[in-house]
Amino acid sequence: MMTTARTIRAFWVLLACMTPRLAHAQKTDTLGTDTTAERLGLWARSSRTSGLLLTSGKTYNRVEGLPVYIGPVFHDSSGKAAFNVSVLGIIRSADTFHWDHENLGHNLGAGMRVGRERGYELDISSYDLVAPVEKWQLPDPDAGLAAFFVRRDFRDYFNRHGAKAIGTFHMSSRSSLAVEWSDERWAAERTRSVFSVFRNGKTWRANPLVDAGRFHTAVARANIDTRNDDINPSTGWLILAEYERGSGRVTDAGLASPLARPAPVSQLAYGRALLDLRRYNRLSPNSWINARLVLGGWLHGDELPLERRFSVGGVGTIPGFDFRKYQPGTVDVSQCSDGGQPPPGNPAQCERVALAQLEYRSELHSSLLDFLNWRPIRLRGIGFTVQPTAVAFVDAGRGWLVGQPSGTLEYSTHSFPRFGTFRTDVGLGIDLGIFGIYVAKAVSSSKEPANVFLRLHRRF
């Protein structure tokens, strides 16, 4: 009975996390979709129909389990303007959906958009959410399914309770400029009793204690996308740039290594930026070479709060190195700890980070695969095929602190670490179209064993 219940639970969570990926696994399918599920379903699609919405948060983690959103949504239009209102409550599956303040949240929003592809949009929202510290490393489905199946959570989390307003100018269907202002209370979240299919008796990695307090942030964001496809691109650019100006009062400081933060401050004001630059190039009808560069970190003002710090390592960045692995006595340029015992959970502590990724992709063909793809596999009206592509990749990256130059961890404001101090790896894999299997081996630290991992999405 327990095995049956576990299988059913695994099936539902798998669909809840994977459906956005399956929906883009191949070109548009001619079979009509289930319109009932668009309005009411655990993995509701982007329906424009008003009514009652029941949907998952498209993720799974050691703090919430599976967040379930339920409430009314309203969509209307007048000429070129479209209006949206949603009133969603959140119940989380941690501690078997226990009804308490940790398991309850909300997300209320109202917005207006003028123009379909080119136009502008105004949105306001009020929320009580669990948010990841570093969302840029790994997509939600990959992070969620790793936590659900193998009890590995590749993110850290904190609570965001407040409101924000966003103004967006859409230059095209996928390129935009936006400004955002928010007033929020940030708080630490604890690791909870959350189910996983395998290794369910193992202890979760602790969720790090972050800085609690009230913060105001102003963000300017640019998203420039010239790719020919947003899921499986073969040509074009994707440029994501963000500047954040934040200020706040810390009422309860989180835990950090002595070198990363000698003494916490109660009042702070900071400037922070993040640039994610990706280029996709087709070399031939069946081969591509793609590159990614990520630069982020402190720009000015006081030190960054722990919610806004950086790290590298693990399947989302440098998979040849284990995620948040602690090696006693070793200066860690992935999390920026000085070699002593790190705080519980080994949190991200770097004030700046740099990551470079390069991959070569070559599509594979065989008569067997052509036979298997004769009729697409269908799941809820979505057809997809197996499209194997061989992948070879290299990665290099590290984080560092800003301050008085010292050793290999602290650098001055205008300095950049030598490449010889970066963590590097190489790897091979096969991308089947709906998921990929890879193996990565550390180069800069030859004693590290090879890591085998799966990805739902392409690496970048």
Language model region names:
Residues 2-12:
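Bacterial N-terminal signal peptides that target proteins for export
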Residues 46, 99, 122-166, 200-383, ...:
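C-terminal outer-membrane beta-barrel translocator/porin domains of Gram-negative envelope proteins
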Residues 76-79, 114-118, 169-173, 226-228, ...:
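Outer-membrane beta-barrel strand-turn architecture
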Residues 48-60, 71, 80-112, 124, ...:
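Transmembrane beta-strand segments that form the barrel wall of outer-membrane beta-barrel proteins
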Residues 26-102, 108, 126, 136, ...:
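Outer-membrane beta-barrel initiation region
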Residues 219-222, 427-428, 432-434, 448-460:
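Outer-membrane beta-barrel "beta-signal"
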